[in-house]
């Protein structure tokens, strides 16, 4: 993450930590260049207006050096011409400030899926295959389509089988801070997924007073 706004950077880092991601934070281009030169990253989130330079120059050098790490630009510029320039310089996507964290996470997932390819991003548990790019669950040749939040919830469980997730944790992962939702919303989505997993080798188990976890059926 290349961002000089400490409050925003802290919020982004904390949000991605909930997803199990490790985030290095650079406040300027010099630190960002040092990080990129010594470490391989899955994704770069890049602010444009930085105290020691223009993020677009960093992006141009990044691509000139044949570095294929995907870059999502965080920008306050909303003009179409600005966005076209960013894409032409090699940005994989952009998010306009102020942004919704749920949208930022969704764009990151989409870019990473394109980068890795559909086959590499499929997850399998107990004979059930999750294809995030197609938004489907497949078991015994039976394909179930997933809506956006259903997909996000399945990804959380499939990425960490047997791990217990509280309702509050799942609410933080599925909904933005601006959305007024209750724990009942999580119960509704878990109920939908249980129906789609019925008859497969996987199930979402309720752990009393703690939350939910993905387990293999006995």
Model segments located where?
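Short, Lys/Arg-enriched segments at the junction into DNA-binding effector domains
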Residues: 109-164, 168
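Active-site phosphate/pyrophosphate-handling residues
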Residues: 57, 84-85, 152, 169, ...
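ABC transporter nucleotide-binding domain catalytic core, centered on the Walker B motif
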Residues: 19, 126, 133, 140, ...
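DNA-recognition element of transcription regulators
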Residues: 100-113, 145-155, 167, 180-198, ...
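Generic structural signal for secondary-structure transition and capping sites
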Residues: 41, 67, 113-116, 137, ...
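Short helix-coil junctions and helix-kink-helix linkers
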Residues: 173-178
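Residues at or immediately flanking beta-strands
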Residues: 22, 70, 120-122, 185, ...
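N-terminal/domain-start alpha-helical segments
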Residues: 1-115
């Amino acid at each position: 993450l290349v961002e000089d706004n400490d409050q925003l950077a802290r919020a982004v880092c904390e949000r991605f930590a909930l997803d199990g991601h490790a985030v290095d934070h650079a406040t300027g281009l010099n630190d960002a260049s040092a990080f990129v030169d010594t470490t391989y990253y899955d994704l770069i989130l890049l602010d444009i207006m930085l105290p020691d330079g223009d993020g677009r120059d960093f992006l141009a050098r990044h691509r000139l050096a044949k570095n294929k790490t995907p870059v999502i630009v965080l920008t306050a510029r909303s003009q179409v011409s600005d966005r076209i320039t960013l894409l032409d310089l090699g940005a994989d996507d952009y998010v306009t400030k102020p942004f919704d964290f749920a949208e930022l996470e969704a764009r990151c997932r989409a870019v990473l899926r394109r980068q890795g390819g559909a086959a590499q991003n499929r997850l399998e548990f107990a004979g059930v295959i999750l294809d995030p790019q197609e938004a489907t669950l497949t078991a015994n040749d039976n394909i179930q389509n997933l809506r956006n939040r259903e997909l996000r919830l399945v990804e959380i469980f499939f990425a960490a089988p047997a791990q217990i997730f509280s309702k509050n944790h799942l609410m933080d992962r599925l909904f933005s801070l601006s959305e007024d939702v209750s724990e009942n919303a999580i119960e509704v989505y878990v109920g939908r997924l249980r129906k789609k997993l019925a008859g497969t080798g996987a199930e979402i188990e309720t752990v009393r007073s703690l939350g939910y976890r993905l387990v293999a059926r006995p």
